[in-house]
Amino acid sequence: MTNVDTTIDYMDQASFLGLRALGHAPVIQWTWIYRRDVDLVGLRRFHHNLGRGLLGRRIERSPLPFGRHRWITCRGPADIAIAPESRSNRDVQAWLDEQAALPIDPEHGPSWRLALQPLIEGGAVVTLVASHTVVDGVGLVIAVTEAATGITRDLDYPAAGSRTKRQALLEDSRAVVRDVPGMAKSLVSTVKMAGKNRADIVSKKPRATSAVVEPTRTVIVPAVTVHVDIEQWDERAASLGGTANSLSLGFAARLGYRLGWVAEDGSVTISVPVNERLPEDNRGNALTAVTLIADPHTVTTDLTGVRSGLKTALTDLADTRNELLAALPLTPLVPRSAARRVEGLVLKSKVIGSSHVGDLDPAANRPDGTDADSFAARMAEHITSDHLRRVGGIFFPLVAGRVHGEVWVSIGFCNADGTTTREQLTEVAVQALADFGMTGTVE
């Protein structure tokens, strides 16, 4: 049996707890479009390598209800899911939505899948969908880049069921005993933090939602991707006193304004994930986050406020990081009802997540070994109409990055009534670009 510590990190266990408590969790979807035939030999090599990197695993639960779960080896699907019939270019987004909606499960599998859709006009679309519990955005960048360049990792995780139930009970019970001092310390810190932030917690007001109650149904959250030439993006950012990253935040603020995703004072709250992944770091989610307030009315002419706000937030994180992570050792003890309440508090706060993965390695745009003509990445999640009404609408975290001479920004949004259309979201994205004096394509 492996001597590697296969215990999942508290952050990953929290993500898994959220999935089981809420019945849904985010997935990350990467998409490549080829305007010529895809090299299936190269793509199958890429698929093989993905299962031998950070994606090649799933979770095996502890037999203890309050135990720590573990990673086990799982290579993923045996082959690429190739659509039997070609579809038109105009159906690409519908196909991507269908792929994002297919079951992905970090415990029962598959925790990821790779699919290909031939196009009537020529070429094909390739998409990779992965559980956010198994890998975060930066982790997926690493997994894809390594797979595309032929690099594999020996994670040395055991196979499913390699421990007998008796063995698992004994090992996990000992682990719980070892964790008790840390849990006690965490409880004290959490109580102190809750007392300090009590005013913020009790002052949360739910957003107004539709009074019409309809039967619940699955909602396809409209999604679009903005593509802008890198030189245009960088020149505009510099002219506004910002950076490529701060322009992404300004763009997020402007989208929030145009979609009505603002606070009572008209400001926009943006949550920015902060990567904490170290070399050879096998955590699924190796990140924290900072929050900043942006004025959507000034970002189109001056990005210095957003830039300095992010810098201040990152500086403050050095002092607040331990406080933010203090409660994580209590994760195995959190009841599902508490997870559902936390979700309600978070989603009703009208925060916009904005993730900028930076410049991708060119290899990340070569799943079959050659450059794709177009690339995008986004967050997606199974959402019901009941969920939308309960939380007052959904604004998926924006995902932005740079590759193949372009900046891309993915946007996913739907109002509480589920009536937002992709055409409306496209119009908003075009208007937000125009607010900054930029042009691009929205697809």
Region spans (language model):
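Soluble acyl-CoA-dependent acyltransferase catalytic core bearing the H(X)4D motif
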Residues: 6, 32-41, 45-52, 59-392, ...
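Long, Pro/Ser/Thr-rich low-complexity/intrinsically disordered regulatory tracts in eukaryotic proteins
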Residues: 21, 27, 266-267
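Short amphipathic beta-strand and strand-loop transition segments with alternating hydrophobic
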Residues: 114-116, 397-400
